[in-house]
Structure formats: structure tokens, C-alpha cells
């Protein structure tokens, strides 16, 4: 079983000793309810580091009013079992008041990149993400940290924060992991009924449709985005498409689509809000 730490002080003491022994530390920050996508992050961390630390913390500051903080799935026992299966050395699962004690005041503001796409629909979300990630980097002080490309905007923002604040950690991006039918793994998939899940597959199918259009010579981003939106919206349990955007790899919007660009979507299906993205292959 991995060592479980709840207190910053105890974790720091343990890791300080490991660093003194010359051990390299890989870090996977999560909100728990681990799935196959997390396993891939952990596997890569395990291959590249002497010590693997996984944090499990549902961070309240990245949830807005009326979002799913209270109902976000939690199961520490199951998470610990998965961590054990994947050879994790340390799990850090603090309480909220350990991370944000009474009187906590400071936050990281990420600027323009945090106001578009997800940021438009979840104001302040990325400031909350950046704040907790910087805190965790300061607590763990890892050599490398692992982030999935499924949360592509989050990944780009963390890269920006690390660069801008001179944080000495290597950010390692890990490709999206999909279920057999193409649905991207997400802790929020648990909210979907079987029928809703069927409708959620329209996201992946819309990427294949876009890829087909691009392969056939369509390069107009507006037309491709319209086709994606129309395809997803005609599925029965889709309550709305928050956005469909096509950007370069640094999230600058594109008018003409090229290989390597990103298609990013956010879709509300039943009670779940799902985000996904696709790297243009053609």
C-alpha cells in the first residue's frame, strides 16, 4: 500500500529525505475517483522517476457557484487500491483546511488564457486550478509533473504558469485515454445513464466527422465547427454545446485548419458537462 499523508509537514519531511538520497520525484495531481486516464499518467511517472507521488484533493476554489463540488465523486479507498496496483509510493490526501487554512488570502491569476473557452463558462476556474497546482508544486517539489491532454486548456495554462513563475518542474503531457467506443475517460462519466452515454459518444464521432471533412479538403474552421455542433446537437440527451473551437497548439483560434491544430468542445449531456479535444491528423 502507498504511504498516505494528510499533513503538509509530514509529507515534506518524508520527501526531503528522499531528495537527500538523490531520488527523483514524479508527481500526478488529481481530484481522485481515479480511472484509466489517471493510470496512464501514473504509469509514465513510474517509468521516469524513483518516487511517485499522487495527490487526491477535490479543490473547492476551482468550482463555481452551482457547479458539482458537493456531488463530485469521491472514493479514497478505491483510489488507494488503484495507486497500489500502479506502484505509487506516496498518496497525499489533505483536508480542505490543511490546504486553505483560515485567513488564506493569496491566489494565482492566469490572465487572458484563463478567460476563453472553459474560462468563459467557468469564470475564475483556472485561477483556482493554478493556485492549487502552484501550492502542490511547492509542497511536493517534484522533478516532473504529469497532466493529461484531455484537459488541454488546463495543460497549456499550467505550462504558462510554470514558465512565468520560474517553477523548477518539468511538465509532462500525456495523450488522452479513451474507452473502447471512443468516449474520453473522465471522473464525470459516472453521472451518465446508459442512454446519455450513447449521446455522449457523439463528441468522439464528431471528431471523426471533422477529420473526414479535413481529409476531403475542407480547411475552413467555421464550416468544420458548424458541422461538429450540428452533429452533436442532434443527439437526444445533449442539453447544449457550450463551445466548439479550433485553435493552434497554443490555443490561438484558427480560421484555416492545419495538421496539429486542436478541436476543443464542451458539451452538456444529462447532468454531466463533458470536455474533450482532438489533435487534427490530416
Curated annotation (Swiss-Prot):
Subcellular location: Cytoplasm
Highest taxon in the source lineage: Bacteria
Keywords: ATP-binding, Cytoplasm, Ligase, Nucleotide-binding, Pantothenate biosynthesis
Binding site for (R)-pantoate: 62, 154
Transmembrane segments: none
InterPro entries documented for this protein: Cyt_trans-like, Pantoate_ligase, Pantoate_ligase_C, Rossmann-like_a/b/a_fold
EC number: 6.3.2.1
Record-level Gene Ontology MF annotations: ATP binding; pantoate-beta-alanine ligase activity
Additional information: The reaction proceeds by a bi uni uni bi ping pong mechanism.
Protein name: Pantothenate synthetase
Gene: panC
